[in-house]
């Protein structure tokens, strides 16, 4: 669209006029830029029209005009312009840099021209030089306002970053101008650019005789004053500049050129001795970068001072507490703060970069005196704190230095390892002065803790260094020097560590810890470079395994040994150590799995399972071995119980299954190819149950049944469909062979159902529970044989009181196909047929409904199930079981989006009425079950009908139930005639609304908030409903913290406050009191006029909460009192 001349003038006037809004000015800018972009207006025409605005003596108009032209150019960076126009514009904006009133526009224009795309016409080197000279001569950066300063720095950054070759000839002038421009800058955004400018400037002038070298002192004086960075800006700054970013920028600036070395290193060493932790951290980080970038030749002169400062930093940042806990086996054993970590990093950098620095370390007097300390104090606890600190620091310094490189490791070992072995009693000097191994070292009664700690640190350093080499390299010859020393002493070292492990006196915890840690370190040397032979490695495994299998209970040494074995197993698996894996399998895994399969291991079975599962989880082959072992152990123990009535065996089965489910199944799920192993385990469970015809004695094995159900669910849930079918077929064959099928002949009539008793044998109950678990976890694509008979069986057992049967029925109706091409869990039963069996209509005569599904399906109050729920049968037990079963069936239907759930919901609602269609007054227990049925329907279940167990889940199913049920419950609450019915209706409503997504609540807050408040009031009268009360209170809390809910809360403020005040003294649940006080604080977001009238009542109620027996409640009360006390009558009422 072409801009007419009069429109262009209007746009120009709008932008220049400072009285116009920023949005109007932006619109004018966009309109002009768009015209230029689509060539309906040329840049020449625009400049001609703007001549008056660009040259007028009115400073404000001229500044706005120049800024407009600059902003337009910024929008057209990719639009081609010919060289003449670009050259002219460069000249114009370079000249305007002298016009301080138009400085902003001039800087924006220069930046826009410098950033033009290559294909669109760019500035020439001559133009760049002219612009740079104009800037240096005319722009006093520090005299500008913040925005203009930032633009000026960005212009300098662009010159250095994109046009560096063009400005190289400016030399001294450029460096001097840079110093002048950045001197005294304080704004964080500008400083980020300033530090980058120095970093960009350094590589332009690398010559020792260049301008940067001669002016390095002045430039460093300008930036050095910022170190260490003192950052006071808040987190609310728009630019969101962090101290870490600024500090990193300053670090890069300081280390950018070696010409800063004479000034930077002394400054950094001085700040390293500061008492401010942040100064120490910044100094250490900067020294590390400087060491790398300045080079060895420049750093050498500072080595003495560096070592002294670094050593002092190690001493000041290290505590004297050395942990001997299990978690410390794979760590140094003491807390490392940021200062310590950065000191370690710097030391490693210095040693790795120049091996001569290691001379300062090795020759230090404290390195030599540490051996006297070790010898003087054999026990760590006997050491005074200065001695403990000395041992820990020197050990850390030597370990870090050894880990820096192969050469440094060799030097460290050659300097102190023999002396350390002598201190530990492993070597001794003969009369001729020769050093030989002490043959009696293993029987020494004194173990030097400091020496053991230093030895382990050095061994760990050597081990970690070897791990860094994937294979032997040309430098591995150097590695032999240090490793050969370890190899020559590996046998006595392992003996010393083993001796420490075997200590059994009261003061042996440190001995045991250091012994196990030493064995662990020796056992984790890698591959061909390992100084530990296979025989010695196996001796380590034997020692640690013998501790696990010893009949000594769960002691400290047992836990340490287990942790060490797990670490070694993980190490073997990670680095694919095939030889070590064979040893680990035969010595550790086989022994522990054998114990797990044994009924007479002499140890608590839980300990054996814990050790075996932890060890075997470290590798796929070990997992496979354990699952097979557990399968054998399960069959053996279950058989022992069936035959001999050994209750210890059935208890072992329970623990075994829990171990399999909780420890191994998650690991198996991560490993490809092990699924069939679990399927075989599940089928073996069924075979063993089938083989054991009857118990030798009856028992109440609820724990075993629950463990077996959980395992079966998990295994079936992760199995493939074909594998699920195999398990289902085996399970069905076992069910068919027991006494359970006899119940299929029980007619679904009141006469037959009233005679039902919960009288299944323990074996039948186990079979039923396991079969229900299989059905619960099966995929919709799995095939269930003889589904109609099984549905009848599950329905009867449901009415006998077995909840797993109800959950299985809910899962079946959730996954069954519709019979018309839908997903089929069973080939011989459609969803309609299943519902026909469950909701049996023709009950009076005792006739079954037609199995071909031709009869009309009625789910409402005329079905057998619904009449049982409504109390027609006269049996309270049967009534409550039917209600619970109906809830699980309804949940399955609801999740798949089947409309039959509405009829089920209506039956449950009918049970909540004071006068229902049955004409009978329902028992309070039945009404309670009906109310809680809505919790089953709406809440998420861990044991069935979830994604893990392949449930069919239709989106928004909870929202649909909410929209259907809530209006019905609301109407019934309003018309309820008894307090019991009213309470139960509120319980049902609470279950519904506390289980829907919060967005649903917020969208309906205006309607729901009065109901929630009434519900809180009603439910607070009965302690039985305390958990339901809390869930409802959480819903209210969610509405009070959202803007949608606050709008409704404003209208009900007096009722809400009154309700919450009562709940602050609710005696039955602490979290109710705590949450109600938090809600009172949230109410302060409401308009002042709504809440201020209740200030006195709230403060009086909170005074009582200050004496609450629970600390959390008292803390919330203090916050609430302070918040409510702070509002005054003069606060803003709008």
From Swiss-Prot:
Q: Where are the HEAT repeats?
A: 959-998, 1002-1047, 1050-1089, 1092-1130
Q: Name one GO cellular component term.
A: cytoplasm
What SUPFAM superfamilies does the record tag this protein with? ARM repeat
Q: Which InterPro entries match?
A: ARM-like, ARM-type_fold, MMS19, MMS19_C, MMS19_N
Q: What happens when the gene is disrupted?
A: No visible phenotype.
The entry's family comment says: Belongs to the MET18/MMS19 family.
Looking at the keywords, is Metal-binding present?
A: no
Subcellular compartments: Nucleus; Cytoplasm
What is its quaternary makeup?
Answer: Part of a complex composed of AE7, CIA1, MMS19 and NAR1. Interacts with AE7.
Superkingdom is: Eukaryota
The name this protein carries in UniProt is MMS19 nucleotide excision repair protein homolog
The species this protein belongs to is Arabidopsis thaliana (Mouse-ear cress)
PANTHER family associated with the record: DNA REPAIR/TRANSCRIPTION PROTEIN MET18/MMS19, MMS19 NUCLEOTIDE EXCISION REPAIR PROTEIN HOMOLOG
Swiss-Prot/TrEMBL keywords: Cytoplasm, Nucleus, Repeat
Which GO biological process annotations does it have?
protein maturation
């Amino acid at each position: 669209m072409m801009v007419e001349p009069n429109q262009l003038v209007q746009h120009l006037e709008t932008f220049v006029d400072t009285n116009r809004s920023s949005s109007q000015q932006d619109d004018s800018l966009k309109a002009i830029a768009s015209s230029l972009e689509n060539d309906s207006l040329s840049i020449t025409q625009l400049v001609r029209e703007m001549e008056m605005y660009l040259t007028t003596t009115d400073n404000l108009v001229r500044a706005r005009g120049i800024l407009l032209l600059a902003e337009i150019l910024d929008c057209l960076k990719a639009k081609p312009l010919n060289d003449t126009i670009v050259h002219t514009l460069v000249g114009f904006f370079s000249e305007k840099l002298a016009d301080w009133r138009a400085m902003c526009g001039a800087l924006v224009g220069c930046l826009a021209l410098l950033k033009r795309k290559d294909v669109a016409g760019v500035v020439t080197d001559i133009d760049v030089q002219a612009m740079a000279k104009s800037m240096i001569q005319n722009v006093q950066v520090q005299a500008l306002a913040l925005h203009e300063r930032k633009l000026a720095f960005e212009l300098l950054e662009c010159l250095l970053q994109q046009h560096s070759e063009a400005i190289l000839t400016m030399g001294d002038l450029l460096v001097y101008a840079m110093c002048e421009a950045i001197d005294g800058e304080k704004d964080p955004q500008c400083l980020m650019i300033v530090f980058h400018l120095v970093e960009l400037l350094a590589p332009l002038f690398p010559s020792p005789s260049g301008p940067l070298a001669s002016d390095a002192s002045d430039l460093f004086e300008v930036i050095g004053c910022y170190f260490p960075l003192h950052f006071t800006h808040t987190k609310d700054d728009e630019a969101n500049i962090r101290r870490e970013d600024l500090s990193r920028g300053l670090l890069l600036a300081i280390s950018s050129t070696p010409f800063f070395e004479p000034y930077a290193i002394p400054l950094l060493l001085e700040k390293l001795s500061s008492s401010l932790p942040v100064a120490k951290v910044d100094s250490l980080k900067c020294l590390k970068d400087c060491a790398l970038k300045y080079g060895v030749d420049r750093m050498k002169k500072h080595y003495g001072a560096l070592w002294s400062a670094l050593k002092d930093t190690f001493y000041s940042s290290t505590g004297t507490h050395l942990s001997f806990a299990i978690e410390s086996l794979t760590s140094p054993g003491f807390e490392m703060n940021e200062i310590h970590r950065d000191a370690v990093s710097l030391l490693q950098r210095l040693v790795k970069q120049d091996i001569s620095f290691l001379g300062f370390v090795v020759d230090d007097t404290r390195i030599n005196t540490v051996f006297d300390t070790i010898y003087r104090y054999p026990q760590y606890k006997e050491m005074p704190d200065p001695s403990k600190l000395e041992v820990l620091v020197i050990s850390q310094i030597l370990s870090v230095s050894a880990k820096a490189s192969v050469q440094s490791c060799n030097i460290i070992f050659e300097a102190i390892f023999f002396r350390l072995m002598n201190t530990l009693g492993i070597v001794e000097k003969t009369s001729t002065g020769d050093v030989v191994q002490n043959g009696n070292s293993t029987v020494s009664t004194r173990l030097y803790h400091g020496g053991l700690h230093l030895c382990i640190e050095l061994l760990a350093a050597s081990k970690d260094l070897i791990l860094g080499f994937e294979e032997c390299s040309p430098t591995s010859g150097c590695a032999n020097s240090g490793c050969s020393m370890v190899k020559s002493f590996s046998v006595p070292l392992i003996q010393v560590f083993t001796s420490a492990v075997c200590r059994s006196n009261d003061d042996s915890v440190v001995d045991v810890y250091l012994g196990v840690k030493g064995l662990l370190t020796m056992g984790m040397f890698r591959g061909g470079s390992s100084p530990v032979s296979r025989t010695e490695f196996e001796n380590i495994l034997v020692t640690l395994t013998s501790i696990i299998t010893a009949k000594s209970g769960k002691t400290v040494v047992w836990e340490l040994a287990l942790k060490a074995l797990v670490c070694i197993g993980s190490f073997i698996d990670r680095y694919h150590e095939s030889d070590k894996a064979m040893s680990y399998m035969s010595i550790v895994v086989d022994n522990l799995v054998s114990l797990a399969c044994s009924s007479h291991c002499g140890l608590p079975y839980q300990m054996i399972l814990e050790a075996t599962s932890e060890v075997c989880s470290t590798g796929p082959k070990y997992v496979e071995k354990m699952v097979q072992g557990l399968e054998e152990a399960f069959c053996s123990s279950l058989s022992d119980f069936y035959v001999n009535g050994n209750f210890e065996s059935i208890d072992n089965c329970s623990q075994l299954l829990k171990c399999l489910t909780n420890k191994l199944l998650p690991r198996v799920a991560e490993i490809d190819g092990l699924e069939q192993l679990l399927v075989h385990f599940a089928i073996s469970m069924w075979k063993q149950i089938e083989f054991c015809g009857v118990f030798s004695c009856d028992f109440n094995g609820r724990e075993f049944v629950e463990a077996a159900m959980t395992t079966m669910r998990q295994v079936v849930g992760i199995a493939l469909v074909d594998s699920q079918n195999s398990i289902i077929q085996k399970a069905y064959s076992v069910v068919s062979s027991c006494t359970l099928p006899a119940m299929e002949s029980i007619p679904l009539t009141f006469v037959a159902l009233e005679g039902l008793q919960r009288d299944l044998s323990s074996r039948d109950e186990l079979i039923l529970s396991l079969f229900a678990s299989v059905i619960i976890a099966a995929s919709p694509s799995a095939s269930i044989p003889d589904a109609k008979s099984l549905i009848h069986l599950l329905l009867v057992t449901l009415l006998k009181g077995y909840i797993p049967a109800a959950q299985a029925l809910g899962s079946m109706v959730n996954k069954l196909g519709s019979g018309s091409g839908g997903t089929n869990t069973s080939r011989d039963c459609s969803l309609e047929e299943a519902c026909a069996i469950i909701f049996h209509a023709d009950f009076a005569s005792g006739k079954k409904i037609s199995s071909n599904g031709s009869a009309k399906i009625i789910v409402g109050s005329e079905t057998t199930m619904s009449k049982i729920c409504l109390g027609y049968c006269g049996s309270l037990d049967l009534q409550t079981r039917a209600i619970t079963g109906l809830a699980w069936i309804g949940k399955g239907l609801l999740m798949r989006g089947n409309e039959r759930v509405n009829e089920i919901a209506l039956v449950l609602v009918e049970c909540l009425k004071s006068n229902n269609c049955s004409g009978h007054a329902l028992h309070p227990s039945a009404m309670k079950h009906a109310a809680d049925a809505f919790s089953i329907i709406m809440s998420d279940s861990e044991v069935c009908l979830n994604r893990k167990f392949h449930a069919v889940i239709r989106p928004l199913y909870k929202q649909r139930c909410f929209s259907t049920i809530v209006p019905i419950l609301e109407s019934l609450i309003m018309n309820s005639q008894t307090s019991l019915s009213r309470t139960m209706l509120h319980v049902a409503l609470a279950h519904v609304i506390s289980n829907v997504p919060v967005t649903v609540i917020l969208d309906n807050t205006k309607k729901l908030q009065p109901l929630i408040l009434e519900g809180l009031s009603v439910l607070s009268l009965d302690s039985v409903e305390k958990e339901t009360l809390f869930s409802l209170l959480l819903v209210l809390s969610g509405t009070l913290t959202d803007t949608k809910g606050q709008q409704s809360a404003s209208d009900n403020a007096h009722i809400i406050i009154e309700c919450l005040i009562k709940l602050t003294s609710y005696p039955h649940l602490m979290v109710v009191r705590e949450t109600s006080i938090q809600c009172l604080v949230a109410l302060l977001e409401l308009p002042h006029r709504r809440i201020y009238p209740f200030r006195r009542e709230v403060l009086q109620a909170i005074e009582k909460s200050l004496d609450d027996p629970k600390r959390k409640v008292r803390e919330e009360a203090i916050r609430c009192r302070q918040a409510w006390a702070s509002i005054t009558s003069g606060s803003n009422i709008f």
